[in-house]
């Protein structure tokens, strides 16, 4: 099993979304689907992940103490679901660009504790209910699913895509429960709305996209491509208090840099801000170390109530192109100002991307920190909760804090694995200090 994304509802119940290859995955009575649907053999040798019988999506909910499985269901069709499937023989294809990109997607909850999933599928019979599009359009489509809080029924479920490959990387909601979906597409006929910011495919092997979908799933209100003539992909999406739309992604092209923003020339990570109708670019910047290469794989993104923009990502030789985080922008208030080139990078920009408020590395001096996919989160106070593959190659150099979770079977300040161990850090950027790390 793979855990791709977590979120807590208003009662602090923990909701999980991921992929499973198990026919005995625990489900609860009356759930939407208690049967494993399976798919094609799938093996990712670069991280050892093997699904002999293919994959389904699973969605599960635990109580706030983690002591009770409140609800759990399968979600899938006859082919692989819940993975951004690499269909080429090479390690990286057009949508699975970074190490770990096969396990992208996101889970969110609304004010009623209904559950939303952004993901990808290759199944022509994925369960669609009240669908915008009930047909698999290409080799792989993005999917958007809304389930009720008990996971007993689908409120709506739809394919989103064109005649090539598409993936769903992230979603967010506004106060009216309209859904904003983002990801990557190789389809030049991906649906966009007339008058949108970029209504036509811009070229290259992949574009990003943003779709705004009506609260009841009945229509696409606004939709646009995001991209250049080269590779581009959007990994995260957020809204500010004005419902302007922000995305965080990667590019190998020349993304626009608007007046008055903080930027680093010849960099390959981008942040863009569009109006709610997705027809106007309000601000755009590129950030990185100016070496012309992609430096980080995005892992978390947020916009706080004041309009400050937070991001997290990791870089190093595991990434395509032997990337490095050396010479990323670092501020005087950094938690860690030096790097071995294979660490996490954390950044905060001021409103409208106008200034660099915070830039720091986080990680060990020898090991190559990374993630094997999935998402982590900031809260609206600007605190990050990040899970990490730490201490890789049996190192003990991941930064840990005094009094962290007890040094026992369940937590340690040393790496008890022959390779990587799970590390977790929590950082409040307003305090400029690590609050907890285990």
Name every feature range the model reports, one short phrase each:
Residues 1-438:
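A sequence-level/structural motif corresponding to short, flexible coil/turn segments enriched
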């Amino acid at each position: 099993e793979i855990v791709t994304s977590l979120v807590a509802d208003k009662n602090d119940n923990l909701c999980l979304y991921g992929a499973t290859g198990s026919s005995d995955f625990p489900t609860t009575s009356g759930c939407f689907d208690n049967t494993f649907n399976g798919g094609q053999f799938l093996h990712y040798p670069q991280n050892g992940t093997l699904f002999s019988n293919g994959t389904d999506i699973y969605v599960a909910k635990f109580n706030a103490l983690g002591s009770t499985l409140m609800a759990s269901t399968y979600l899938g069709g006859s082919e692989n679901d819940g993975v951004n499937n690499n269909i080429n023989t090479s390690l990286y294809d057009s949508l699975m660009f970074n190490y770990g990109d096969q396990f992208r997607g996101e889970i969110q909850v609304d004010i009623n504790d209904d559950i939303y999933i952004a993901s990808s599928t290759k199944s022509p019979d994925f369960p669609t209910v009240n669908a915008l599009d009930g047909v698999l359009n290409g080799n792989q489509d993005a999917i958007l699913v809304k389930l009720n809080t008990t996971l007993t029924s689908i409120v709506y479920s739809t394919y989103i895509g064109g005649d090539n490959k598409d993936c769903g990387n992230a979603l967010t909601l506004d106060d009216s429960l309209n859904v904003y979906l983002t990801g990557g597409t190789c389809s030049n006929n991906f649906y966009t709305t007339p008058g949108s910011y970029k209504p036509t495919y811009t070229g290259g092997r992949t574009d990003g996209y943003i779709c705004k979908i009506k609260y009841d799933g009945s229509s696409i209100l606004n939709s646009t491509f995001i991209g250049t003539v080269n590779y581009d992909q959007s990994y995260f999406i957020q809204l500010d208090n004005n419902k302007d739309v922000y995305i965080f992604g990667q590019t190998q092209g020349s993304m626009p840099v608007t007046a008055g923003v903080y930027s680093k020339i010849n960099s390959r990570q981008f942040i863009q801000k569009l109006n709610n109708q997705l027809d106007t670019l309000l601000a755009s910047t590129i950030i990185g170390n100016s070496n012309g290469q992609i430096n980080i794989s995005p892992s978390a993104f947020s916009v706080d109530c004041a309009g400050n923009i937070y991001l997290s990502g990791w870089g190093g030789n595991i990434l395509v192109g032997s990337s490095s985080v050396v010479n990323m922008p670092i501020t005087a208030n950094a938690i860690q100002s030096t790097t071995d080139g294979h660490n996490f990078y954390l950044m905060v920009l001021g409103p409208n991307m106008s200034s660099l408020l915070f830039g720091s590395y986080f990680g060990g001096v020898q090991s190559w920190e990374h993630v094997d996919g999935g998402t982590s989160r900031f809260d609206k106070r600007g605190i990050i909760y990040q899970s990490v593959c730490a201490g890789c190659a049996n190192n003990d150099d991941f930064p840990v804090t005094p009094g962290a979770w007890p040094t026992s079977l369940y937590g340690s300040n040393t790496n008890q694995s022959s390779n990587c161990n799970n590390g977790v850090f929590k950082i409040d950027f307003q305090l400029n200090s690590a609050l907890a790390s285990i």
